[in-house]
């Protein structure tokens, strides 16, 4: 038995989530809601992607539908979740990928429209189950949790590293810097923006800005609340990104021990296929289309004065993230059968 899935917001995350999920037997995609461009633009951008290339299935628009290998998905252009007749399409699960609705109050209309579960492709600002696959997905209780967030791409990169180091050595405190690719929250040329640095042209500068990824770790490890913080630096690339982690740990360690812990974790459950480990001298482009959330650059691991640790972790901030979101959707789907 499949569950019926709808997508709200067919931008970067919505389109790539559909690509990553297409063909999984638990998920039947039936509806797309996107306010810009109509079905023609949706079909075209699903098929052709400047970063991730041409998608293998045949994709076309036919009236108010998108056809994928002749399978029809209905299409609408409503501005608010409450305006979409999700119940008419029999939608059980919505992937909320618009980036606009991030509080329980703005997400509650889905449930009033008959949707059983909602997974948000962004952090939710208030109470919602914050899931990082491989780290705390065991917390999901089908009868209790209906609104879930798949956290952020950077949190999905950082959390596996924190899990291994905190459980293996103990983390006193730390500072995180994510070297992050451009996103649509920035501007191509200078334009007004509430963040004056993001107001500047993306292709001409390295742009320091905020990230909540480090503080979000406290939702998973409450004992680290107030002990981790971080910053993002947006760079003029489209893919992939890098997280620079600096921790003070509880006991003396070595580069060899750090790398051994991370390598071992990457080879067994629950982080196998989520955490990677790489000893070759690779660069960011080599991680484009990598479905893992976090890949350790073992050559860059450092230890200073026995307890200060530096770890670099690569991630495809789009493809890695949507693969975890789809894994969460499959977990939810199995709970609804």
Swiss-Prot record:
NAD(+) binds at residues 12-13, 80, 184, 317. GO terms for biological process: gluconeogenesis; glycolytic process. GO terms for molecular function: glyceraldehyde-3-phosphate dehydrogenase (NAD+) (phosphorylating) activity; NAD binding; NADP binding. Pathway: Carbohydrate degradation; glycolysis; pyruvate from D-glyceraldehyde 3-phosphate: step 1/5; Carbohydrate biosynthesis; gluconeogenesis. Its EC number is 1.2.1.12. GO terms for cellular component: cytoplasm. Keywords: Cytoplasm, Gluconeogenesis, Glycolysis, NAD, Nucleotide-binding, Oxidoreductase. It catalyses: D-glyceraldehyde 3-phosphate + phosphate + NAD(+) = (2R)-3-phospho-glyceroyl phosphate + NADH + H(+). It is found in: Cytoplasm. The active site is at 153 (nucleophile). The keyword Mitochondrion does not apply. The record marks 180 as: Activates thiol group during catalysis. D-glyceraldehyde 3-phosphate binds at residues 152-154, 183, 198, 211-212, 234. The keyword Cytoplasm applies. Belongs to the glyceraldehyde-3-phosphate dehydrogenase family. Catalyzes the oxidative phosphorylation of glyceraldehyde 3-phosphate (G3P) to 1,3-bisphosphoglycerate (BPG) using the cofactor NAD. The first reaction step involves the formation of a hemiacetal intermediate between G3P and a cysteine residue, and this hemiacetal intermediate is then oxidized to a thioester, with concomitant reduction of NAD to NADH. The reduced NADH is then exchanged with the second NAD, and the thioester is attacked by a nucleophilic inorganic phosphate to produce BPG. Homotetramer. This is Glyceraldehyde-3-phosphate dehydrogenase 3. It comes from Trichormus variabilis (strain ATCC 29413 / PCC 7937). The gene is gap3.
């Amino acid at each position: 038995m499949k569950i019926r899935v709808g997508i709200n917001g067919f931008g970067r995350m919505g389109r790539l989530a559909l690509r990553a999920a297409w063909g999984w037997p638990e998920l039947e995609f039936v509806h797309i809601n996107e306010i810009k461009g109509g079905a023609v633009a949706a079909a075209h951008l699903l098929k052709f992607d400047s970063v991730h290339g041409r998608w293998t299935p045949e994709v076309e628009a036919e009236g108010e539908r998108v056809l994928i290998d002749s399978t029809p998905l209905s299409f609408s252009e409503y501005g608010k979740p409450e305006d979409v007749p999700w119940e008419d399409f029999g939608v059980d699960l919505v992937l909320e990928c618009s980036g606009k609705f991030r509080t329980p109050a703005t997400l509650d209309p889905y449930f009033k429209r008959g949707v059983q579960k909602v997974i948000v492709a962004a952090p939710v600002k208030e109470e919602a189950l914050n899931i990082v696959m491989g780290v705390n997905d065991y917390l999901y209780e089908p009868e209790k949790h209906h609104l879930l967030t798949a956290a952020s791409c950077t949190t999905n990169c950082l959390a596996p590293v924190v899990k291994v180091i905190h459980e293996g050595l103990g983390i006193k405190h730390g500072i995180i810097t994510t070297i992050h690719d451009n996103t649509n929250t920035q501007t191509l040329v200078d334009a007004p923006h509430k963040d004056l640095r993001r107001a500047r042209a993306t292709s001409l500068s390295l742009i320091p800005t905020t990230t909540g990824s480090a503080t979000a770790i406290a939702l998973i490890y409450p004992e680290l609340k107030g002990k981790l913080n971080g910053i993002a630096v947006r760079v003029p690339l489209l893919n992939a990104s890098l997280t620079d982690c600096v921790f003070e740990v509880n006991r003396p360690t070595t580069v060899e021990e750090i790398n051994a812990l991370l390598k071992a974790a990457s080879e067994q459950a629950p982080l196998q296929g989520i955490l990677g480990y790489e000893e070759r001298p690779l660069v960011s482009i080599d991680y484009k289309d990598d479905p893992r959330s976090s890949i350790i650059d073992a050559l860059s691991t450092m230890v200073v004065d026995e307890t200060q640790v530096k770890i670099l972790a690569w991630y495809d901030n789009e493809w890695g993230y949507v693969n975890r979101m789809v894994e969460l959707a499959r977990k939810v789907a199995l709970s609804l059968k």
